[in-house]
């Protein structure tokens, strides 16, 4: 594949060029597990499925895949435990979500931009997120 930074790709091509093995769905699951862990001591498949509005069988498949990729530990009918890698990524996804929501709320003069954040959060790299955090802070200070 062409490694020229000025080369154009299809959307799928950019995804294939990504260094991370995480899909947007995997990111959503890790983010939700962190959110649930903030409220309760442990997470089970049914709670995860309910909060992501998916079937328990779909959640079970994704949790199994995340376990195989070493992001979490899970035994069938047991609790979900994040590995250190899973915890680091999950916490970053929470940060990314908050940065985007804060920026879009400031931009649109609103209190919540959940739908827009969910649609775009998977497509911005860490540098862009960090710069949006700085920009949002500066814009907030101007008010």
What are these model-predicted stretches?
Residues 6-21:
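Short, Lys/Arg-enriched N-terminal segment that forms or immediately precedes the first helix
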Residues 20-30, 83, 94:
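Short helix-coil-helix linker/hinge
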Residues 78-96:
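Basic, amphipathic "hinge/linker" alpha-helix immediately C-terminal to the N-terminal HTH DNA-binding motif
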């Amino acid at each position: 594949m062409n490694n020229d930074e000025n080369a154009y790709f299809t959307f799928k091509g950019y995804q294939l060029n990504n260094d991370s093995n995480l899909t947007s769905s995997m990111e959503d699951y890790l983010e939700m597990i962190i959110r649930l862990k903030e409220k309760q001591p442990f997470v089970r498949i049914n709670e995860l499925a309910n909060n992501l509005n998916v079937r328990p069988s779909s959640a079970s498949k994704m949790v199994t895949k995340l376990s195989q990729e070493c992001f979490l530990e899970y035994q069938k009918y047991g609790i979900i435990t994040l590995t250190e890698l899973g915890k680091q990524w999950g916490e970053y996804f929470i940060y990314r979500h908050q940065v985007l929501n804060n920026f879009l709320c400031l931009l649109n003069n609103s209190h919540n931009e959940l739908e827009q954040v969910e649609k775009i959060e998977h497509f911005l790299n860490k540098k862009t997120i960090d710069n949006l955090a700085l920009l949002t802070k500066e814009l907030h200070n101007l008010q």
